[in-house]
Amino acid sequence: MKLTRITIDPGVCTGKPCIRGLRFPVARLLGLLATGTTRDQILADYPYLEPEDIHEALQYAALLAEDETVDLAR
């Protein structure tokens, strides 16, 4: 699966994955979704984001969950 909307650039957000180089970290978008912010609200609050950005951020998170393990006890 090729993700074209997720960019990683050492000069943008210290190399954290971002949405299309917009200095909007994928983690921030996922955090908004995790706290119950709806897609429609995210798109209204951040008009430069597109529905496809949200979809691809979720795909990225799913790929990470397949390959990474996080110590939940910390």
Give, region by region, the residue ranges found by the protein language model.
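C-terminal structural segments of small proteins and small subunits
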Residues: D40-A44, Y48-R74
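A short, structured beta-strand/loop element
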Residues: M1-D40
